[in-house]
């Protein structure tokens, strides 16, 4: 079983923001594989289904970003899964809009959701898909930037990027992170 967690903030106020790109990707996975979000459990909204012959749980934590680790820890415990069964999908301001990067481990890199997950589960060794949301302009506050929405001219690129991230997640499940990194990084 794989637990696929898209990071974001709950509530309509944050829908479509750069920081909710993880939610956009797991919603794309839900749509592509017909896995509806039906349950509220472990501080997350979840959907259960199959991808490439593997049981999966899709999850969108309903904590705020900086508490995402609580939901991830509860999901791992509830489903008796290891961190090797985890795929985390989130926004990255160090990647250009349109880029994705797959990693098998690494630091939080300033991302509070990843920092929370590493703190709660006690390791940075888990598969992740970082989705580029662009670099913060010098005159912007970081929080304002990540909570902003994409301008119209970036929306087509982001739709394609979300689709690439969905396909990358499928590749991780089907062939492993190394193969997915070779194909998508």
Which role fits each region the language model picked out?
Residues 2-105, 115, 119-129, 136-141, ...:
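Nucleotide and nucleotide-moiety/phosphate-recognizing core
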Residues 110-113:
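Hydrophobic alpha-helical segments within soluble ligand-binding/sensing domains
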